[in-house]
């Protein structure tokens, strides 16, 4: 969590560590390969998303992953959903819990979005050997 006295660099480094813990080396490619055009986005994702918000003490990483899966399913964001499915496994979310999240989300996001999300979740789980 960013405090008044903390520098942006500290939040960035904390976010970098958390990204690597969640997604492993494959999840670091977009940051490590960012050029001048892409770096502002990667800085925001790393520093704000992971260094400031994901690292707050109010929710566990597992619960944050579960919430993120449900939100991304509702937004029909397949690339982000696949990335966060993989990160969720690293945060202790089981395949069965992911199935239940998608089933529950289906009631609120609709069948087309749920069907796409289920397909992308299956692909992500298979890719990391968690299916």
What are these regions (language model features)?
Residues 45-49, 66-71, 101-106:
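Short alpha-helical scaffolding segments that buttress acidic/His motifs in well-ordered protein cores
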Residues 66, 73-99:
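Mid-chain, well-packed structural core segment of small domains
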Residues 86, 103-107, 122:
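Short amphipathic alpha-helical surface patches that mediate protein-protein
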Residues 111-112:
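Substrate/cofactor-recognition hotspot
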Residues 55-74:
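Short hydrophobic interaction/assembly module
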Residues 96-100, 116-119:
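A glycine-rich phosphate/pyrophosphate-binding beta-strand-loop-alpha-helix module
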Residues 1-61, 90, 116-131:
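Acidic, glycine/proline-rich low-complexity segments that act as flexible tails and inter-domain linkers
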């Amino acid at each position: 969590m960013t405090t008044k006295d903390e520098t942006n660099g500290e939040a960035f480094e904390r976010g970098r560590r958390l990204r690597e813990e969640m997604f492993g080396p494959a999840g670091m490619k977009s940051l490590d390969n960012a050029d001048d055009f892409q770096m502002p986005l990667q800085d925001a994702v790393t520093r704000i998303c992971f260094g400031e918000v994901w690292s707050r003490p109010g929710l566990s990483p597992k619960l944050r992953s579960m919430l993120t899966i449900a939100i991304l399913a509702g937004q029909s964001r397949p690339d982000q959903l696949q990335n966060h499915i993989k990160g969720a496994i690293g945060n202790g979310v089981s395949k069965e819990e992911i199935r239940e999240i998608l089933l529950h989300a289906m009631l609120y996001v609709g069948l087309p979005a749920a069907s796409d999300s289920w397909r992308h979740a299956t692909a992500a789980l298979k890719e990391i050997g968690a299916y």
